[in-house]
Swiss-Prot record, chain A:
Family indicated by similarity: Belongs to the ATPase gamma chain family.
Localization terms from the record: Cell membrane
Name of the gene: atpG
Keywords: ATP synthesis, Cell membrane, CF(1), Hydrogen ion transport, Ion transport, Membrane, Transport
Protein name per its UniProtKB record: ATP synthase gamma chain
UniProtKB/Swiss-Prot annotation, chain B:
Pfam families: ATP-synt_DE, ATP-synt_DE_N
GO CC term, one of those recorded: proton-transporting ATP synthase complex
Organism, scientific name: Lactococcus lactis subsp. cremoris (strain SK11)
This protein's encoding gene: atpC
Subunit architecture: F-type ATPases have 2 components, CF(1) - the catalytic core - and CF(0) - the membrane proton channel. CF(1) has five subunits: alpha(3), beta(3), gamma(1), delta(1), epsilon(1). CF(0) has three main subunits: a, b and c.
Gene3D superfamilies: ATP synthase delta/epsilon subunit, C-terminal domain, F0F1 ATP synthase delta/epsilon subunit, N-terminal
Matching NCBIfam families: ATP_synt_epsi, PRK00571.1-3
Main subcellular localisation: membrane
Protein name: ATP synthase epsilon chain
SUPFAM superfamilies: Epsilon subunit of F1F0-ATP synthase N-terminal domain
CDD domains noted in UniProt: F1-ATPase_delta (cd12152)
């Protein structure tokens, strides 16, 4: 019977309180998830339009790209933008993405000088620092519904570093939100910008009047395009984070309930045992007289 | 739909700001002001931070004003699409917020000029330009 009645009682009380907190956190995450999902949807329209205009512009003539953001350079150094959360209590969300990044890096690179990390979110930054991996940029404390302005700092940084040839390609690593139970770690190539994958889309036959000229518009549009792609993955990652937080907290609440059940049974047994013992003692005492 | 109508969509990362029919639009591109009529030749151009004036087909006097912070305009098959970092209709502009942003930008500009940081000056000037543009557009109410 080990624990005394009182001990079990305190344990039950404290577990109950924990389950209340995790239950509340689950609801908070659920509310945030809903918001994030509608936000992601609104952003989707923007991303599609930017993509369409860029495709229209790029496919309207067949000259090789001259813009620095589209030219493929020889890859000497790769940048990884890793999106993690700032807080814990999100289940396997962070370990999932970090594991996939580490295994990918091990597969691709033999030397430390071949890659650099840009960390978005405290967990990722601390993880790489603890492993002595060079982290060239850290952004912490991103809000739950990040605005475009907030994210622009890291996007501008990434684009600038790319243009300064700090690295020759950029991958964004994040958890893609599938539904509230499932998310998958993704690694997408953002820079240099390429349109190879849209081979099935028919190139538009419309020729466009360009004002002032192609290069100027590309100079304005491509950073916007890159920004929107990276921002899109950040929004996606945030949605996945809220979903992971919700699932983790739901599991925690369920576990707390089953612990409370077990403890209650234990408590009742202990109570019963002590009553039985008391009776035995009284009976033994009476017969001794 | 009558022939002399086009659709204007203004899209920002926060969603669709404006989606209506129009029969005449004026916008300021990097090359200068352009007027857009239905069935115009397909065009792509960069926009300045300025106002967008939209004449609506339902009424001769019905005009909407939209503050646009840069971005790109695409005209194709009588569909005008504007993608910008941010955009606001005149009736949605928070005047006191814009006023505060203007004062903040003016102060920051003084500081930046005193410290002679040319990057900072450029950045603040853009912010000031945006605030002034918003105020200007909201005055059409």
């Amino acid at each position: 019977m080990g624990a005394s009645l009182n001990e079990i009682k305190t344990k039950i009380a404290s577990t109950k309180k924990t389950s209340q907190i995790t239950g509340a956190m689950q609801m908070v995450s659920a509310a945030k998830l809903q918001k994030a999902e509608s936000h992601a949807k609104a952003f989707q329209t923007y991303a599609e339009k930017v993509r369409k205009i860029t495709t229209d512009l790029v496919s309207s003539d067949n000259e090789p790209a001259k813009n620095p953001m589209m030219i493929k350079r020889e890859v000497k150094k790769t940048g990884y933008l890793v999106i993690t959360s700032d807080r814990g209590l999100v289940g396997g969300y962070n370990s999932n993405i970090l594991k996939s990044v580490i295994s990918n890096i091990r597969k691709r690179h033999t030397n430390e000088s071949e890659y650099t990390i840009l960390a978005l979110g405290g967990t990722g930054a601390d993880f790489f620092k603890a492993r002595n991996v060079k982290v060239s940029y850290v952004l912490r404390g991103l809000s739950d519904q990040p605005t475009f302005e907030e994210v622009r700092a890291i996007v501008t940084e990434a684009v600038e570093e790319y243009q300064a040839e700090e690295f020759d390609e950029l991958y964004v690593c994040y958890n893609h939100h599938v539904n509230s139970l499932v998310s998958e770690a993704r690694m997408e190539k953002m820079l240099p910008i390429s349109f190879d994958e849209k081979g099935d889309e028919k190139a538009s036959l419309v020729t466009f009047e360009l004002e002032p000229d192609r290069e100027t518009i590309l100079n304005q549009l491509l950073p916007q395009y890159a920004e929107s792609m990276i921002y899109g993955s950040i929004v996606d990652a945030k949605t996945a984070e809220h979903a992971a937080g919700m699932t983790a907290m739901r599991t925690a609440t369920d576990n707390a309930h089953s612990v409370i059940n077990d403890l209650t049974i234990q408590y009742n047994r202990a109570r019963q045992a002590s009553i039985t013992q008391e009776i035995t003692e009284i009976v033994a005492g009476a017969s001794a007289l | 739909m009558s022939e002399n109508v086009m659709t204007l969509q203004v899209i920002t990362p926060a969603g669709v700001v404006y989606d209506h029919h129009a029969n005449y639009i004026t916008a300021r591109t990097t090359n200068g002001e352009i007027g857009i009529l239905p069935n115009m030749i397909s065009t792509i151009a960069g926009l300045e931070i300025d106002e967008l004036k939209v004449r609506r087909p339902d009424d001769e006097t019905h005009v909407d004003y939209i503050a646009v912070n840069g971005g790109i305009i695409e005209i194709k098959d009588s569909l005008v699409t504007i993608v910008a970092d941010s955009a606001e209709r005149n009736r949605d502009i928070d005047v006191s917020r814009a006023e505060r942003a203007k004062i903040r930008a003016e102060k920051a500009l003084e500081v930046a000029k005193a410290e002679k940081k040319s990057d900072e000056i450029k950045r603040v000037e853009v912010a000031l330009h945006r605030a002034l543009n918003r105020l200007n557009v909201s005055s059409h109410n």
